Regions:
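Conserved alpha-helical "signature site"
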Residues: 1-142, 149-155, 180, 187-204, ...
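Terminal helices and disordered tails flanking the catalytic cores of nucleotide-processing hydrolases
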Residues: 1-5, 244-279
Length: 279
């Protein structure tokens, strides 16, 4: 399970679905310039894609009192940036049948974790910079995709038990992944995005999140720090626990941002999650 084998695995993955590729083309000129009518029409033409998007946006922690029943309503409420993330998330998971048990979580728990990362990014960072929050929230939703590749590699190896045990004991999943594979799941996500010709800035951020590959400048480093905040607060071992929120809050302070606001948002998102878990 070396790095070269991972690259070969990614290179062998088939293209995304026709619907996903058509939607990607709509975003070529930027999410703010997307033709909403065409976007809704393409999503509605793919019954499974439409159903998956509606399922995700009706998640309890979004807090809608009434069920969102149409794609048009979903796009109107969430905007084109979030819809991009939802479409890409579904399209990638179509091509990577994940064995998330390698990370000691179920597929449902993995999806909930990704949604919570995106929701936290949007709710926290929108007060700081709404436009960039809209750009970063979809990335937060799909940045864990590399774990699906690594999990499948582990499941097919003789090291499954050792990997699961290592994940459960690890205080830093990225360090553990690097020791195991010579790379991290976020860098693998960058390779996946590159393979499928997704947003180039997403590729750059993911590839430099754990492994400084190039001089990316202070602005890009700042946005990478926002991803670090979110993945520290919400990850496979800790989903908005008291400890993970506190650790993420320290990063927020290092960014010279209001950590009290971050903690308030994190705990607000945590409440419905905790309620559901206890049911």
């Amino acid at each position: 399970m070396d790095y070269e084998q991972l690259v070969k695995t990614i290179d062998s993955l088939p293209p995304l679905s026709d619907s996903a590729m058509l939607i990607q083309k709509l975003y070529d000129e930027g999410a703010e310039n997307v033709d909403i009518i065409k976007l809704v029409r393409i999503i509605e033409s793919d019954a499974l894609l439409a159903a998956n998007i509606l399922k995700m946006i009706n998640a309890p922690f979004y807090g809608f009192s009434n069920k969102i029943a149409s794609v048009a309503q979903a796009v109107s409420l969430f905007g084109t940036y979030t819809v991009y993330g939802l479409v890409t998330n579904y399209a990638m998971q179509e091509k990577i049948q994940a064995q998330t048990s390698s990370y000691n979580i179920t597929s449902m728990q993995f999806n909930e974790m990704c949604q919570m990362q995106s929701h936290l990014m949007m709710q926290w960072y929108s007060k700081i910079d709404l436009r960039h929050a809209q750009f970063l929230a979809p990335l937060a939703l799909i940045m864990e995709a590399g774990k699906l590749v690594l999990a499948n590699e582990v499941a097919q190896s003789e090291n499954s038990a050792a990997f699961k045990q290592g994940v459960s004991k690890s205080s830093n999943i990225q360090h553990f992944e690097y020791d195991f594979f010579g790379t991290t799941s976020y860098y693998v996500s960058g390779l996946l995005f590159e393979h499928w010709n997704l947003e180039p800035l997403y590729v750059k951020m993911l590839k430099n999140l754990d492994i400084e590959e190039e001089d990316i400048g202070s602005k890009m480093e700042y946005y990478i720090d926002t991803l670090d905040v979110v993945r520290t607060a919400v990850n496979v071992n800790n989903i908005l626990t008291e400890k993970s929120i506190a650790e993420a809050s320290l990063i927020v302070q290092d960014m010279n941002l209001d950590h009290f606001h971050f903690e308030k948002v994190a705990n607000r998102i945590k409440a419905p999650f905790e309620k559901k878990r206890k049911q």
